[in-house]
Amino acid sequence: MRASNYLFSTLRDAPTDAVVTSHQLMIRAGMIRQVSKGLYTWLPTGLKVFRKIENIVRDEMEKAGSLEVMMPGVQPAELWQETGRWQKYGPELLRLQDRHGREYCLGPTHEEVITELARNELTSYKQLPMNFFQIQTKFRDEVRPRFGVMRSREFCMKDAYSFHVGAESLQETYDIMHKAYCNVFDRIGLNYRPVRADTGSIGGAYSHEFHVLADSGEDDIAFSDSSDFAANIELAEAICLKEKADAPTQDITEVFTPDCKTIAKVAEFLKLDVTSTVKTMLIKAVDENDQPTIAALVLRGDHNINEIKVEKLAGVVIPFEFADEADIIAKTGCAPGSIGPKGLAEKGIRVIADRSAAVMSDFCAGANKDDYHFTGLNWERDCAEFEVADIRNVVEGDPSPDGQGTIVIKRGIEVGHIFQLGQQYAEALKATVLDENGKAQVMHMGCYGIGVSRIVAAAIEQNFDEKGILWPESIAPFDIAIVAMNYDKSEAVRTECDRLYAELKAKGLDVLLDDRKERPGVKFADCELLGIPHRLVVGDKGLEKGTLEYKYRKAGDNEDIAIADAVEFILSKK
């Protein structure tokens, strides 16, 4: 590509509304432009990177045995109503009507449509397993689209779906797709982790997320410093090595704690370490007769509640929701901020203590009396009726759940998610095949998603410096830039640039020949901003010496190379 025929929309300054690095650099490098909140046009440079990622994804899907299809972006409400997700999905599902009043949605995902295809086209066990994929635009009506293409309303995703006679076959394909995802991210050149994850609104019993490690990530991922264990913090089990509480050494004492509505203020007022306190939170629940009630969650003062874990407990209202203050006062006799476990069971409130809280002794907790707390509280002696469950987030230094090493927590950007869906969609949509005995069997399903457009941003978040983007070479918009000094004025420069351009292109490289009438500094700055890995500078002075100036984007120094060796030199660097 000759730069004189290319769209350079580079900017020296980042827009004020771009918060994360990837958004800033994608705007500055002329990769995207915003059309509306959460909606972007991809310009040539951005689309070149996008296509390279797309091609890697497509290649690995085909190697994994997946067949490419293309499904409609607009989906009929009837399919979503059959699975029950029309009501459950929430406002992220953009719903619309046609001129006849028929309801549709813009597809955020395609489980319903692909299962409709499978129930019509797959009739015999002999056709299974079958794996389909597509690379297509999705739409989710995000309440707060932000971070550029990282969390936009419209985005491109590769979604694949597999169909099986049984769970064993599903597991085999799941493992193949897991490996294919690792191959994708290895080929791109990202530092990533596959982690166990919650299945969320998609459903199913088993899933893994793939996270690119970056400080700007929205998710916390926990992994062992000594093994392969890795899980989303929502799913990582919090291990407590202590088996039971120590014997009491203090008497229970009621203490006046004015205006201490938080654990931090209570600990400061009483001059206690926060680890010797517990916090008690009341949430909405249902009793054994399915009637509304409240339940109490008790955690050590420095720990945070894990809503996903709590939602898996019997009797908890889903989605997780704290109890209303009026109900709290009616049930406990005090306002939030002074609530503790002592006496709650006697008031008919179910008490659930986290594992770490359940082995504490002589601790401080609310006295269920406004502006008062207890010190010297002990479970068996003072509040013996309680359950124990894992309801907190892991923290750094916790034992790894696999027994090897301790937990380290890093921020991650989710770029892929795979699920074992089981039979929930196939059952809802009556997708069956005949087995070897001629009996109808509900198919098992797997679902596998990769955020193609999101990978572009995630790669930048992991690869940049003060000058611009440091692309992994596999997805850089150009492999090499030939920067011409006075291309329009020097015949020698023009001849050598054209020769190099033709030879490097013939070797299969993606080449940018910068033949613009711009100052050298502008050309160099654009090369660095765009993250082009290799740069050759062709000028009259170098030609007189028989040399070209070479620079590798990720290194600081320039070096002179012989003109005769230039093509082979560049190929050796690839």
Curated annotation (Swiss-Prot):
CDD domains to which the protein is assigned, alphabetical: ProRS-INS (cd04334), ProRS_anticodon_short (cd00861), ProRS_core_prok (cd00779)
Reactions this protein catalyses: tRNA(Pro) + L-proline + ATP = L-prolyl-tRNA(Pro) + AMP + diphosphate
A GO term for molecular function: ATP binding
Signal peptide region: none
Top EC class, one word: ligase
Key words of the record: Aminoacyl-tRNA synthetase, ATP-binding, Cytoplasm, Ligase, Nucleotide-binding, Protein biosynthesis
Gene Ontology biological-process entries: prolyl-tRNA aminoacylation
Compartments, as annotated in UniProt: Cytoplasm
Alphabetical list of HAMAP family matching this protein: Pro_tRNA_synth_type1
Domain notes: Consists of three domains: the N-terminal catalytic domain, the editing domain and the C-terminal anticodon-binding domain.
Family in the record: Belongs to the class-II aminoacyl-tRNA synthetase family. ProS type 1 subfamily.
Function as written in the Swiss-Prot or TrEMBL entry: Catalyzes the attachment of proline to tRNA(Pro) in a two-step reaction: proline is first activated by ATP to form Pro-AMP and then transferred to the acceptor end of tRNA(Pro). As ProRS can inadvertently accommodate and process non-cognate amino acids such as alanine and cysteine, to avoid such errors it has two additional distinct editing activities against alanine. One activity is designated as 'pretransfer' editing and involves the tRNA(Pro)-independent hydrolysis of activated Ala-AMP.
Name of the molecule in the record: Proline--tRNA ligase
Natural source organism: Marinomonas sp. (strain MWYL1)
